[in-house]
């Protein structure tokens, strides 16, 4: 594989995707506030842990109504306008935190900001779907995923350096970077919302999974059983992956003691380095494989990546496991987006993005709590064999879904 072939699919992407790539980097670099919410509430606002936990949960949960609102509006009005309006409102409510005197108001301003932040997500996903086709979506989604991770690799580091002495700059920086990303979209990306004539033509003429549909989100979603089952199975993936954020640091603190947080930070650095430097290579190597088979492969990498932690007592093994599950993360994130969009009607892209994001996100929401119950009863080490089995099961179920979907399409083709 030569260098030219690595970037072949990316070079062919439309200009608008590269604009979104740079906008994604800028937006992610400036995500200073929400990753530090727990520290901000406890150290700066002096809330106790219970009160801080409530407000963190509130800000997280606030994205759900935002997703539903943004998904609905993105399918009715121009996607670009919806993204610009909600992103701007999200930024302004973060900036408003600098203007209030009473600290009790700040968590509510951040919660409102989270609602609008959630609302811009379906519009962004719908725009990417509109601007791409099944042939170039693998490259497009992997590029945007790379942009997000480049930003997140830089942003928290800057925030950590500025937090103690220049906290106000974090609120200003978060606001400014969001507005810059909005300006990039406003000036350089054309509206992508499907016109009425193309929707009518799609209803009559198209036969694929992206065919325009009439009816409620629930009827249309349930009429795509393969996408429904994909979403349910992929929820297991999110439960497996959340162990990297919850159980892994607990395990490392137990093994390495006071050095645990430092080593966990190194693990997160390895994760970021692998994503930044290997995403293009991995996607180029797997681009000819069907998206759903790639997602099945990702679960196997999860299985061995997290499973090896059961035997890990040295940092080297933790580093090796991180490389494995990060490769799974790259493949799962990119190709799940591709599969979902390829099975989403053009009339429901915003709403599908919202509802599927919420369903899959339940693994991240309930995963830490269920893992905590397991750890309390059986110990932290015992969870890794369970995670290994769950990942293998997820891979098998995903492959079964591919088998039945492929057989169904073959039957329809020759009937």
Residue spans of the language-model regions?
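Juxtamembrane intracellular "pre-TM" segments in multi-pass secondary transporters
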Residues: 1-14, 192-230
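A membrane-interface helix-boundary motif in multi-pass transporters
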Residues: 164-176, 373-391
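Hydrophobic core of transmembrane alpha-helices in multi-pass small-molecule transporters
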Residues: 25, 104-119, 317-331
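Helix-to-loop junctions at the C-terminal end of transmembrane segments
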Residues: 66-78, 278-290
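Residue-level signature of mid-helix packing/kink "hotspots" within the transmembrane helices
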Residues: 32, 60-68, 152-153, 272-280, ...
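Structural signature of the two symmetry-related core transmembrane helices
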Residues: 81-95, 293-307
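Helix-loop boundary and gating motifs at the non-cytosolic
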Residues: 10-60, 226-233, 237-258, 263
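Cytoplasmic helix-loop-helix junction between adjacent transmembrane helices
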Residues: 111-148
């Amino acid at each position: 594989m030569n260098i030219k072939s690595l970037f072949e699919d990316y070079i062919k992407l439309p200009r608008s995707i590269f604009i979104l790539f740079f906008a994604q980097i800028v937006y992610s670099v400036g995500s200073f506030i929400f990753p530090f919410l727990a520290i901000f509430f406890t150290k700066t606002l002096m809330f106790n842990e219970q009160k801080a936990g409530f407000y963190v949960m509130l800000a997280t949960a606030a994205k759900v109504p935002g997703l539903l609102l943004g998904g609905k509006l993105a399918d009715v009005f121009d996607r670009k306008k919806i993204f610009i309006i909600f992103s701007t409102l999200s930024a302004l409510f973060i900036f408003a935190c600098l203007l209030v005197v009473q600290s009790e108001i700040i968590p509510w301003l951040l919660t409102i900001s989270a609602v609008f932040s959630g609302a811009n997500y379906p519009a962004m996903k719908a725009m990417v779907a509109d601007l791409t086709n099944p042939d170039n979506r693998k490259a497009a989604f992997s590029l945007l995923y790379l942009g997000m991770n480049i930003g997140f690799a830089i942003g928290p580091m800057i925030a950590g350096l500025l937090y103690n002495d220049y906290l106000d700059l974090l609120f200003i920086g978060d606001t400014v970077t969001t507005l810059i990303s909005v300006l990039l979209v406003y000036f350089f990306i054309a509206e992508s919302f499907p016109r009425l004539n193309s929707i009518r033509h799609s209803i009559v003429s198209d036969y694929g999974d992206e065919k325009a549909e009439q009816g409620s989100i629930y009827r249309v979603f349930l009429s795509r059983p393969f996408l429904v089952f994909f979403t349910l199975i992929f929820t297991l993936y999110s439960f497996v992956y959340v162990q990297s954020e919850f159980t892994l640091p607990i395990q490392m603190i137990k093994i390495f003691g006071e050095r645990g947080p430092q080593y966990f930070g190194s693990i997160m650095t390895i994760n970021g380095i692998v994503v930044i430097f290997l995403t293009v290579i991995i996607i180029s190597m797997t681009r000819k494989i069907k998206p759903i088979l790639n997602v099945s492969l990702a679960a196997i990498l999860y299985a061995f990546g997290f499973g090896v932690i059961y035997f890990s007592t040295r940092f080297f093994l933790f580093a090796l496991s991180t490389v494995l599950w990060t490769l799974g993360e790259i493949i799962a994130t990119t190709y799940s987006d591709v599969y979902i969009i390829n099975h989403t009607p053009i009339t429901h892209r915003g709403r599908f993005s919202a509802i599927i994001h919420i369903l899959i996100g339940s693994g991240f929401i309930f995963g830490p709590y269920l893992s905590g119950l397991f750890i309390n009863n059986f110990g932290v080490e015992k969870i890794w064999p369970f995670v290994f089995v769950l990942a293998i099961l997820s891979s098998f179920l995903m492959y079964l879904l591919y088998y039945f979907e492929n057989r169904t399409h073959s039957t329809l083709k020759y009937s």
